[in-house]
């Protein structure tokens, strides 16, 4: 049980990196990017291609791929996403769904259907682990991924809180019209958000390829996991995204103790439970009653009946 909790905690770091970009893009541009998981796979295959064809270390390849992913995000926002911002919710969904299909088939044409991994390029690190008291085995790569997740989210928090660009992003996310009246350049903000979001997707894809295998059509599964982590943790909070990723990872690890197929099922059940609770609270709020029938609710009903 303890080992499963630790493994779930570390898995949450990967989910946090994966979900942060999805949450940022939705928070700033109100776009649910259905190609987010496929962009993560693009980043993974980019790192794999550099390591296989040029003999680069995975870490150096990752450092080269991340700026390219950021440029891809800027290009997508400028030539694709920007044209759908004022078209309602359906068109962005259709456009990003189509983008995901294009990316999947492009990767299939370039790399085939065979699953790939960065394990061999990492050498001993791919299998290295620490033994904790009680005989608990913890892999070094999951720990590194979790540390990277905390560092990345901390850096993003500093960016959003202490820089002019960050304040512009937060203003555009909270009230786009008021931000525009205050002189915030929406196009600049959207491009920055898209660059960060797609780079984070690429980072998550590379982290996955270091610990497991990736294949061209694996994007939709990653999208579901990212979406669940965002909903569980709450949209608009970076540390909430980390919490959502950790809760999702712990649920999956505990589910795997019950049965192998329980890994994904437990995560889905947690997502549905949290989503149902949020919808119930929203419904109670819309009715003008407290979400929980505590003493304030009882007192309010007594006053109303009097």
Locate each region found by the language model:
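Alpha-helical transmembrane segments within multi-pass membrane transporters and channels
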Residues: 22, 56-99, 106, 243-248, ...
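Extracellular/periplasmic helix-loop junction at the C-terminal end of a transmembrane helix
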Residues: 101-132, 257-264, 281-290
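Single transmembrane alpha-helix segments in multi-pass membrane proteins
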Residues: 2-52, 76-91, 230-238
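Transmembrane alpha-helical segments in multi-pass inner-membrane proteins
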Residues: 15, 55-66, 191, 195-201, ...
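Cytosolic-side transmembrane-helix boundaries in multi-pass membrane proteins
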Residues: 110, 174-188, 258-306
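Helix-loop-helix "hairpin" substructures at the membrane interface of multi-pass membrane proteins
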Residues: 11, 133-214, 238-244
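Membrane-interfacial amphipathic/re-entrant helices at transmembrane-helix boundaries
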Residues: 1-17, 46, 56-61, 87-93, ...
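Mid-bilayer segments of alpha-helical transmembrane spans in multi-pass integral membrane proteins
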Residues: 70-71, 75, 96-114, 134, ...
């Amino acid at each position: 049980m303890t080992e499963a909790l630790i493994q779930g905690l570390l898995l949450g770091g990967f989910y946090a990196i994966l979900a942060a970009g999805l949450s940022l893009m939705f928070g700033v541009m109100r776009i649910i990017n259905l190609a987010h998981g496929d962009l993560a796979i693009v980043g993974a295959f980019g790192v794999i291609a550099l390591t296989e064809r040029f003999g680069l270390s995975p870490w150096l390849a990752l450092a080269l791929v991340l700026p390219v992913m950021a440029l891809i995000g800027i290009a997508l926002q400028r030539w694709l996403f920007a044209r759908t911002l004022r078209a309602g919710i359906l068109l962005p969904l259709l456009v990003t769904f189509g983008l995901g299909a294009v990316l999947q088939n492009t990767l299939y044409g370039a790399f085939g259907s065979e699953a790939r991994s960065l394990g061999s390029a990492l050498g001993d690190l791919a299998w290295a682990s620490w033994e904790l008291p009680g005989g608990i085995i913890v892999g070094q790569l999951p720990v590194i991924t979790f540390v990277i997740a905390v560092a990345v989210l901390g850096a993003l928090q500093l960016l959003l809180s202490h820089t002019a660009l960050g304040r512009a992003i937060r203003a555009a996310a909270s009230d786009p019209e008021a931000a525009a009246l205050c002189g915030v350049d929406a196009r600049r903000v959207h491009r920055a958000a898209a660059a960060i979001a797609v780079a984070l997707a690429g980072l998550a894809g590379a982290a996955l390829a270091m610990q497991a295998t990736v294949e061209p059509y694996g994007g939709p599964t990653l999208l579901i996991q990212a979406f669940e982590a965002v909903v569980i943790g709450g949209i608009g909070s970076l540390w909430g995204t980390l919490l959502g990723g950790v809760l999702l990872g712990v649920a999956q690890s505990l589910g795997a103790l019950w049965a192998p197929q329980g890994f994904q099922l437990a995560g889905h059940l947690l997502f549905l439970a949290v989503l149902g609770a949020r919808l119930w609270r929203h419904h109670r709020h819309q009715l003008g009653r407290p979400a929980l029938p505590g003493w304030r609710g009882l007192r309010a009903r007594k006053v109303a009946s009097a």
